[in-house]
Amino acid sequence: EDPRPLDYLSSDSNSQSGGVDLQLEVYLLTEQMQQQELEPKLLTRGSFTNLYWTFAQMLTHHSSNGCNLRTGDMLGSGTVSGQTRDSRGCMLELTWDGDLQNALPGSQRTPIQLPTGEERKFLADGDTVIFRGFCESSDHRRIGFGICMGQVLPAAENG
C-alpha cells in the first residue's frame, strides 16, 4: 500500500485476511435491448480485493475520528475499480482511453458498444443497471447476494 496507512490502521492480520473477496458484476440493459429480448451486457467485473482500505480500516478510521457510527448505519465502499479496462468501476472510467491515472478533463473517450448498435458514454433514460455480488473461494461455498437493479427514469417536468 502506498502510502502506508497509519499504524493504528495497519496489522499483519488485516493485511493477510482483512479484506473481503467480494466479486461485483455490473450489467446494462437498454430499452432497445429489452424490446429485442437480448441479454444484458456485462460492463465490468471487479473485486473488493482491489480496494485500498478494508472495511475494518474504514470503520476504525471513522469511529476513531469522532464519527458517531451506530448500529444500522450504512457504510459504503465507493467505486470498486481494478487495474484492467474490464474491471473499471464506473462508466466514466470504462469509456476513458489511455491511462486513468493521468486522464485530464476533456480526455478522449470511447463509447461502450452495445449489441443493438447503440453506444453509451453515460446512462440514458430507460437504461436498466443490474448489480450482482458474490463471494467464493476454492475451499468455501459460493455465497450470492442476489441482484440489485434500477431503471433510469426521465427527469420530472416542472409544472
Predicted region positions:
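Catalytic-pocket segment enriched in acidic/His residues
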Residues: 1-159
